[in-house]
Amino acid sequence: MRHRVSGRKLNRTTSHLLAMLANMSVSLIQHEQINTTLPKAKELRPFVEKLITVAKKGNLNARRYLISKIKNELAVEKLMTTLAPRYAERHGGYIRILKAGFRYGDMAPMAYIEFVDRNIESKGKEFKALKNDSRNAKLIAEQSN
């Protein structure tokens, strides 16, 4: 019996599902809007909203938890420095899902998943700046050794 079992399997093993959610959440944090199938978007929304709620705490334990979930330190940095302050006054509901018709080929229902109150002009620029800063820091550290 399947009583009170939450979540979707999406025809994947548990490890594959968790890896997919981690990768999709990094893409969503980086670009602040992605296009995917509707069931994946519905599964991704609670995953990312929990990450933002944890990031709003802003302590070391929260940072370590986020790194364990999404395994991308640049995405965690953007969560802690950009997204958490943006949603400091909001209690949940950080993400919206917009239906986008059906995919040509297999008629899969598609959807856009995006952050509420996102800055449309700076799509991915903050993430690229963080990435360049970390690369520059690594280069400086290598040169000093």
UniProtKB/Swiss-Prot annotation:
Keyword Ribosomal protein carried by entry: yes
InterPro entries: Ribosomal_bL17, Ribosomal_bL17_CS, Ribosomal_bL17_sf
Keywords, in A-Z order: Ribonucleoprotein, Ribosomal protein
Gene3D superfamilies: Ribosomal protein L17
Gene Ontology MF term list: structural constituent of ribosome
A GO cellular-component term linked to this record: cytosolic large ribosomal subunit
Segments crossing the lipid bilayer: none
GO biological process terms on file: translation
Record's keyword annotation contains Ribonucleoprotein: yes
Subunit record text: Part of the 50S ribosomal subunit. Contacts protein L32.
PANTHER family: LARGE RIBOSOMAL SUBUNIT PROTEIN BL17M, RIBOSOMAL PROTEIN L17
Family of this protein: Belongs to the bacterial ribosomal protein bL17 family.
Protein name as catalogued: Large ribosomal subunit protein bL17
Lineage: Bacteria, Pseudomonadati, Pseudomonadota, Alphaproteobacteria, Rickettsiales
Gene: rplQ
